[in-house]
């Protein structure tokens, strides 16, 4: 059987990668077709390897060879579970440092040496530590990332421990930060964020109070285009996020829990209106609670007053108890339709 030359196989694998560059791939079977497919497709196998507990240690051993390690651009250890140790993760990062662009951490095995190893990955654009179940001192994390000039995206671990000396160590090119863990009001108040920051997600921050949220949004809110706050935030009051429209006037995408907003959030929108285009209102709670939840009529009032002129996508939780046949919901649906918008009801 006549085989394609390696150059053709190279283009075939490039095409397969292009479907989703940020998804781990396993094209191992294609490498076995012939020698040309192996030579032409090796870069695709290592570009974003599909790692699991069975192949992880073999992969780390394989990339000890210099020609191979340069092929790795993306690493996800989400499926490695507890197979990774800090020393192995550190070795992995050092070996793949040349071209590594994204890194998703494991549930465990990200100690001091691994955090420091980030400093060698000068092309890193994204770090996701959202599933890490170990306590991480941000002093060591920031020590590894503060000089990464291309880092745009980072999600902090749920068990992060802030350090006062890190408040001025945020990388200069960040566009997205996922805040979580033991962040305090004082830490956020003293932090110096880069002007490039455009999108944030706040969740699982048990120490943050209304004052911390207000301080953070007062500082970075005008620059944000996307704001997402997720339940639980146990120290936030019922009105803890009422300031979000005022402090984030340019955010076009907003997702907030009804647990922390009241009708004041919409009443306080300036008469000049807000730029939000996509608004999601989630709710984690029971309808049997004594909490007075926002009503559809609160949004109706804001729309009638022209305060939400650009709202084209509205999504709310079915748990809010807004009955579709009620007059206020019907009015809300009609007003959104008049703006050529769409409405979604979710279970969140």
UniProtKB/Swiss-Prot annotation:
It is found in: Mitochondrion. InterPro entries: LRR_dom_sf. GO terms for biological process: proteasome-mediated ubiquitin-dependent protein catabolic process. It comes from the Eukaryota. One of its GO terms (cellular component) is mitochondrion. GO terms for molecular function: ubiquitin-like ligase-substrate adaptor activity. Its main location: mitochondrion. Keywords: Mitochondrion. Interacts with skp1. To yeast YDR306C. This is Protein pof5. It comes from Schizosaccharomyces pombe (strain 972 / ATCC 24843) (Fission yeast). The lineage of its organism: Eukaryota, Fungi, Dikarya, Ascomycota, Taphrinomycotina.
């Amino acid at each position: 059987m006549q085989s394609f030359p390696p150059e053709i196989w190279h283009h075939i694998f490039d095409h397969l990668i292009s479907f989703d560059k940020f998804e781990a791939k396993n094209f191992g079977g294609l490498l076995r077709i012939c020698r040309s497919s192996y030579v032409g497709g090796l870069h695709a196998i290592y570009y974003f390897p599909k790692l699991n507990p069975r192949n992880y240690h073999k992969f780390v051993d394989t990339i000890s060879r210099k020609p191979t390690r340069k092929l790795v651009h993306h690493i996800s250890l989400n499926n490695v579970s507890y197979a990774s140790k800090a020393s192995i993760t550190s070795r992995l990062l050092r070996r793949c440092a040349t071209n590594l662009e994204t890194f998703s951490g494991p549930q465990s095995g990200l100690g001091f040496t691994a955090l420091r190893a980030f400093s060698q990955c000068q092309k890193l654009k994204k770090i996701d530590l959202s599933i890490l179940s170990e306590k991480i001192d941000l002093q060591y994390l920031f020590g590894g990332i503060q000089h990464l000039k291309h880092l745009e995206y980072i999600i902090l671990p749920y068990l992060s421990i802030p350090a006062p000396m890190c408040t001025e160590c945020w990388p200069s090119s960040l566009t997205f930060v996922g805040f979580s863990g033991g962040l305090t009001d004082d830490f956020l108040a003293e932090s110096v964020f880069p002007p490039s920051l455009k999108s944030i997600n706040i969740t699982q921050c048990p120490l943050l109070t209304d004052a911390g949220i207000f301080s953070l949004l007062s500082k970075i809110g005008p620059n944000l285009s996307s704001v997402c706050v997720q339940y639980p935030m146990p120290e936030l009051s019922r009105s803890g996020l009422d300031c979000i429209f005022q402090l984030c006037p340019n955010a076009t995408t907003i997702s907030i829990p009804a647990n922390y907003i009241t009708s004041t959030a919409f009443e306080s929108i300036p008469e000049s209106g807000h730029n939000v285009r996509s608004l999601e209102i989630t709710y984690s709670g029971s309808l049997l609670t004594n909490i007075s939840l926002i009503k559809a009529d609160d949004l109706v009032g804001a729309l009638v007053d022209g305060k939400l002129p650009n709202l084209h996508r509205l999504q709310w939780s079915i748990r809010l108890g807004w009955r579709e046949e009620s007059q206020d919901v019907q009015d809300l649906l009609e007003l959104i339709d008049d703006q050529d918008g769409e409405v979604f009801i979710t279970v969140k």
